[in-house]
Curated annotation (Swiss-Prot):
Record-given protein name: Serine hydroxymethyltransferase
Post-translational modification N6-(pyridoxal phosphate)lysine, affected residues: K229
Main enzyme class: transferase
Organism for this UniProt entry: Actinobacillus pleuropneumoniae serotype 3 (strain JL03)
Gene encoding the protein: glyA
Keyword Oxidoreductase set for record: no
Length: 421
């Protein structure tokens, strides 16, 4: 029997210390990784619920195990809320991750060795959009499109590649693209070559849910997303569609279970249901509007300080800063900012002269800082501090600038905690 006073702190102090240290790191560091966000206490409560004990292979009303009546309620809640949130008529909430959601889509609609056309990872795409090191580039014949020197998708280039390679599927979506994707144009190209249009909206799902970024649902045959990132929920995946094709829906359903996964994570599905309810609240739209405002405000500071922003701006939650002109590496910038308690990630830029583990840029995103309460004035100050650190790399005053910046970071983090005591 489990007793009420059982806890990790007493039983496993080494693990508990790691958890406590991570909590302190999140509270005392400014999080600017574009794919990270803070889940609400309600989401975390659902993740820690007794549903973690429940096996529920199958779908609501069609389970292979008994005792699933409450799991059915939870999963149906998540499905119905996601449909309402995104305007979908098909939803699968079972994928354990975005990558597994993507694998299920490929498995449902195309065959091994079929050709897919996706965005190059080095130009802002994702591993699962056809990168050679990913299953998507090993199982399928992947052809890649990129962005122009100005940092924009060249739709005529996408069209020409599609006409040449005749893909069975065109993959749209990104992990590091800061502009609006023309979903209608991508569908037009897909229709011209008889391909499915598959959109991975993982990075902008929260913005789309709030109506501050165009939705791909009216254009794509199928859409996937993660449920963290801008959505701000638990780590997991989601498949949606509004194409109206029941045959596609059946294929997607069986491609998740039993083809790619066994039992769903009911506790995570419960957390997804909470996340979707939160995203339907009026204040959620204000939050997402502020995410974009904050990203735009930071961009202007970097440009004023002489740093190149890829595509010269942003229309979403993220942007890339290139250091090619400064001769600085993304790895060095990432490390220096990290010393000042500012967390970013190094990122390749178009035509990057550096290797992927070094890079010539960083990716910056505003979902997490906005969720903890940063306003435009706060992120403008923050961007200035970041430029101070970057300007000082290799100079005599570098350590002093790091120390001064870290003190400012600790002060604002104390004033704007993630989880209020």
């Amino acid at each position: 029997m489990f007793t009420a006073n059982m806890n990790i702190q007493d039983y496993d102090p080494i693990l508990w210390q790691a958890i406590e240290n991570e909590n302190r790191r999140q509270e005392e560091h400014i999080e600017l990784i574009a794919s990270e966000n803070y889940a609400s206490p309600r989401v975390m409560q659902a993740q820690g619920s007794q549903f973690t004990n429940k096996y529920a292979e199958g779908y609501p009303g069609k389970r292979y195990y008994g005792g699933c009546e409450y799991a059915d309620i939870v999963e149906q809640l998540a499905i119905d809320r996601a449909k309402q949130l995104f305007g979908a008529d098909y939803v699968n909430v079972q994928p354990h991750s975005g990558s597994q959601a993507n694998a299920a889509v490929y498995g449902a609609l195309i065959q091994p060795n079929d050709t897919i056309l996706g965005m190059d990872l080095a130009h802002g795409g994702h591993l699962t959009h056809g990168a050679k090191v990913s299953f998507s580039g090993k199982i399928y014949n992947s052809v890649l499109y990129g962005i122009t020197a100005e940092g924009l998708i060249d739709y005529e280039d996408v069209r020409q590649k599609a006409l040449e390679c005749k893909p069975k599927m065109i993959v749209a979506g990104f992990s590091a693209y800061s502009q609006i994707v023309d979903w209608a144009k991508m569908r037009e190209i897909a229709d011209e070559v008889g391909a499915y249009l598959f959109v991975d909206m993982a990075h902008v799902a929260g913005l789309i849910a709030a109506g501050v970024y165009p939705s791909p649902l009216p254009y794509a045959h199928v859409v996937t997303t993660t449920t963290h990132k801008t959505l701000g929920g638990p780590r997991g995946g989601l498949i949606l569609s509004a194409c109206g094709d029941e045959e596609i829906y059946k294929k997607l359903q069986s491609s998740v279970f039993p083809a790619n996964q066994g039992g769903p994570l009911v506790h995570i599905i419960a957390a997804k249901a909470v996340c979707f309810k939160e995203a339907l609240e009026p204040e959620y739209k204000i939050y997402q509007q502020n995410v974009v405002k904050n990203a735009k405000a930071m961009v202007e500071v970097f440009k004023q300080r002489g740093y190149e922003v890829i595509s010269n701006g942003t229309e979403n939650h993220l942007f890339l800063v290139s250091f090619v002109k400064q001769g600085l590496t993304g790895k060095a910038a990432d490390a220096a900012l990290g010393q000042a308690n500012i967390t970013v990630n190094k990122n390749s830029v178009p035509n990057d002269p550096q290797k992927p583990f070094i890079t010539s840029g960083i990716r910056i995103g505003t979902p997490a800082v906005t969720r903890r309460g940063f306003k435009e004035a706060d992120v403008q100050a923050l961007a200035g501090w970041m430029c101070d650190v970057l300007d000082s790399i290799g100079k005599d005053n570098h350590e002093q600038v790091i120390a001064e910046t870290k003190a400012k970071v600790l002060d604002i983090c104390a004033r704007l905690p993630v989880y209020a005591k």
